[in-house]
Amino acid sequence: MPKLAAFPKGFFDAIIARRMTVFEWIDLAGRLELDGAELGPKFLDSFESGYLARVRAAAAARGLELPMLCHSPDFTQPDPSARRREVELAKDLFRVTAELGGKYCRVLSGQNRPGLDEGEALRWVIDCLWELEPHAKAAGVLMCMENHYKDNLWTYPEFAQSHRRYLAILDAVDSPWLKAQYDPSNAIVAGEDQYELLERVLPRVATMQASDRYLEGGTIDDLRDRARDPEHGYARIVKHGVIGNGLNDYDRIFSTLARSGYSGWVSIEDGEGPTVEIGMDNLRRSARFLRGQFDKHWGRRAP
């Protein structure tokens, strides 16, 4: 049976701007039917051990784990010193993840900057991940590479947004300390097949981002045409929605995961809405849907 966490997609800007604290997010997460709360490094005021212990204790007081850190490393920066800073930050974030009690740290390739040479950028990403591999192992933290769309704070979309590049990186870093974080909605945004990708990465899936998207004012073909532009940002026709109400067939996704024996974390990416109350209601509905899916495909939890 998977465990259920949530990432505060709808509250991200408020947390980054400190209109909501990480402790307030943990308190909100504790009101949902969750096993854990997902954090991002920029949610934290400090990486100092005493502060991290207080964050972990706050989660434990709400009956929550902090299983995963949603990091967005940018390994496609042409400046070697910038890539070095990204590597050193990631090393420290493995420690942060472990001190929070987590075992998973998301990694990415970086931004798809104009003018990048594909082969050279792939080598940068692969070299950075191989350098990080022994440090992840030492911390006991799995690097989980997400098939990603675009970080909220980035200018350009993900370099490895296409499945061809994403799989090339996973194949090149064939280590038990680099796993896949599967996000079906990001495959849709890339104009690719989310079910084919799942079958391809199934043996390496360690974590999953559960989100759902719907189209407003456009079609799948429009989205695929837009995905061919390597510099495109968020497509306005793609909207986040309550999980189970969008384009993903979650019965198909979870039956595939259950067949493989998957028992890792599934993290909700939702909480959109004009107010915190509406965002929380959407998170609650998404959590209820996912719990129902877990019961259906893995068997009902013991009371």
Task: Give the predicted meaning of each segment.
Residues 106-122:
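Flexible, glycine-rich active-site loops centered on histidine and acidic residues
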Residues 13-19, 40-53, 74-81, 112-116, ...:
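Acidic-and-aromatic substrate-binding clefts and catalytic sites of carbohydrate-active enzymes
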Residues 1-103, 120, 126-130, 137, ...:
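N-terminal pre-domain/capping segments
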Residues 41, 73, 109, 205, ...:
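Residues that line or immediately flank small-molecule/substrate-binding pockets and catalytic motifs
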Residues 3-4, 36-37, 69, 126-247, ...:
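Acidic/histidine-rich catalytic cores of soluble enzymes
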Residues 245-259:
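A short, acidic, amphipathic alpha-helical segment used as a generic capping/interface helix at domain edges
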Residues 264-290:
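C-terminal/domain-terminus segments
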Residues 37-39, 67-69, 102-109, 142-147, ...:
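Short beta-strand segments at enzyme active-site cores
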